[in-house]
């Protein structure tokens, strides 16, 4: 990694320099099993209205990636019987990239007054905290969704209705320098509220 990104010298240096990596450009080493448990434990500090923990994490080890690729291919061909070679190769690549793969499920709790929307927000924050924890251990991460996150057969590999795949989080070591991407201008997303005078 370059000094420009994911500066771990302090929290106030890390946050404005945080940068994801491309999973296809991640190489070994990745987090150990002990480090992964620590990463998930850190993510448990996520804001969670009602203390519902509406999320789950499944680790897919390297020796299971071949089977995952086969299941992704099967599900894709069921949905798209005319799928081309390049589409199937992309799924194969996705299943095998990066040393570490965590699948995060949004697991809503229906027997509560807490709105599903708030539970979704908590799940997104949980994913982000996993990413921060991965970077804190001096690895790089990438959170992706795409077709597999929205296919029910893929979801059923890891969970069941009403659960949904919130994302596939990959982790490892960056193979080369990270590059910046465009960010929104601050004044586009930040403003101050002022009350309007009443007539």
Q: Could you say what each language-model-derived stretch is?
A:
Residues 1-97, 198-199:
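N-terminal amphipathic, basic helical "cap/leader" segment at the start of enzyme domains
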Residues 97-100, 139, 162-165:
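Short coil/turn connectors at secondary-structure junctions
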Residues 52-55, 136, 166:
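Short secondary-structure junction motifs
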Residues 43, 102, 108-156:
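Small-aliphatic-rich amphipathic alpha-helix that forms the alpha element of a beta-alpha
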Residues 77, 96-109:
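Acidic-glycine-rich active-site phosphate/pyrophosphate-binding loop
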Residues 154-166:
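Short, electropositive alpha-helical surface patch
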Residues 2-17, 164-199:
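C-terminal helix-cap and adjacent tail motif
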């Amino acid at each position: 990694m370059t000094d420009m990104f994911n500066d771990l010298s302090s929290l106030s240096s890390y946050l404005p320099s945080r940068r994801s990596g491309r999973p296809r450009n991640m190489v070994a080493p990745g987090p150990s099993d002990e480090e992964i448990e620590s990463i998930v434990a850190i993510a448990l500090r996520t804001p969670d209205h009602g203390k519902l923990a509406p999320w789950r994490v499944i680790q897919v080890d390297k020796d299971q990636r071949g089977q995952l690729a086969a299941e992704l291919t099967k599900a894709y061909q069921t949905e798209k019987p005319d799928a081309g070679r390049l589409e199937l190769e992309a799924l194969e690549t996705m299943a095998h990239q990066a040393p570490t793969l965590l699948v995060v499920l949004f697991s809503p709790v229906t027997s509560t007054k807490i709105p599903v929307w708030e539970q979704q927000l908590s799940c997104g924050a949980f994913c982000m905290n996993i990413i921060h924890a991965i970077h804190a251990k001096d690895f790089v991460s990438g959170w992706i969704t795409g077709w597999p996150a929205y296919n029910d057969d893929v979801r059923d590999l890891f969970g069941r209705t009403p659960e949904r795949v919130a994302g596939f989080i990959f982790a490892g070591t960056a193979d080369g320098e990270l590059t910046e991407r465009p960010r929104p201008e601050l004044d586009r997303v930040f403003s101050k509220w002022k009350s309007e005078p009443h007539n």
